[in-house]
Amino acid sequence: MPTSNAKVSLDQEINPWEAQSARFDFAARKLNLDEGLWKVLRSPAREIIVHFPVSMDDGRIEMFTGFRVQHNIARGPGKGGVRYAPEVTLDEVRALASWMTWKCAVVNIPFGGAKGGVICDTKSMSKGELERMTRRYTSEIIDFIGPEKDVLAPDVNTNEQTMAWIMDTYSMHMGHTVTSVVTGKPLNIGGSRGRLEATGRGVMVECDESLRYLNMAIEGCRVVIQGFGNVGSNAARLMKEQGYKIVGIAEKDGGLYNSNGIDIHQLIEYKYRNGTTLGFRGAEATPSEELLVSDCEILIPAATENVITSRNADKIKARIVVEGANGPTTAVADEILAEKRIFIVPDILANAGGVTASYFEWVQDRQGYFWKEAVVNEQLETILRDSFDDVVRYAEAHNVNNRIAAYMLAIDRVAYTIKQRGIYA
């Protein structure tokens, strides 16, 4: 499999914006992209930084910093999650917004790319403090969001309750209920059936398609999953039901291994009761770093960025890597995995189940008509299977790896839209 040549220096390796830009640049060169379009697509259209006060429970006033980056909206409203974490940076949000542009284009849904975040430690904040912070953040960016401008969604440390607060705040400002300003909402206020497990379901679909493409069988296929949150746990549960053997679960505080397969339903119940997978008796405690490089057919990084780097890429033994997380593989590691001929389903395809289901939710909200879960799942799987075929055919036709093919396909679609619309000036 040809390498991507998407080079960055070692000290830039874990900067997500540098990594994304390196991949974009290489794909754009392969496309012979017009220099003007290259400039348009490489740069975010809008970057919003807000600093705002929040009254804490003890009477103190704390200042918080929030971001919303809208990378490109040529194909439709911006679309992307909002994350709450102490380590959120503008570069991270900028990269994630760009990935959303390419992700939406790869699966051919009518959204552009956006992302948001607030620098905060949710573990040290009460529910009331989180609500006040969320509502104030929403009010600070309210002129730039909306069903036809930029649609928000859950991400790291945010959930359907966060989306309900954002939707309510926006609606109060508009003077009427606007459910379609966010996706990932509770069902009773315009959420969609099937949305919660959609990203995990999409990961399973991409694993199925990878095995089909490589003429490998599901039976006996050993899988290691890094991360057991929403994406990882749902992917594990659905894949276990399909006949995959989930032999390893790697989490931040430790991992689990069972060569005969982990009982995923029991593990989900155990984590729900205890808040951790540590201590689960149905598997052997194993350092997470060891699990990433253990023997398996499929490795699914499904938690955070920069999990596969130059430090461990040469030790990866998996035949297939399906990226359930955003940016789990650095550009430097990409080169190493390509040399090892590891089949990669890149993040902008592998975890696109979430944004695809979000698109369905947005459509249902705007129609005021809601689908059965079976319809959501059927439509989701059809789009993701077709998108897999699009990417691998593009890779074969252009003699590039899957990641660069996905970027090229996405860039080509967005660039074509811009050329059709023209530059307003």
Predicted regions and their residues:
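Short, Gly/Pro- and small/polar-rich lid/capping loops
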Residues: V8-H51
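Adenosine-phosphate binding glycine-rich loop
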Residues: L10-N15, S210-L211, K315-A425
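Glycine-rich, N-terminal phosphate-binding loop and its surrounding beta-alpha-beta segment
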Residues: V50-T122
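Glycine/serine-rich phosphate-binding loop and adjoining beta1-alpha1 elements at the start
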Residues: A85, A105-E219
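General beta-strand structural signal in soluble alpha/beta enzymes
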Residues: A95, L152-A153, H176-V182, G248-E251, ...
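Glycine-rich phosphate/diphosphate-binding loop of Rossmann-like nucleotide-binding domains
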Residues: G191-D295
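Rossmann-like adenosine-cofactor binding region
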Residues: G254-I344
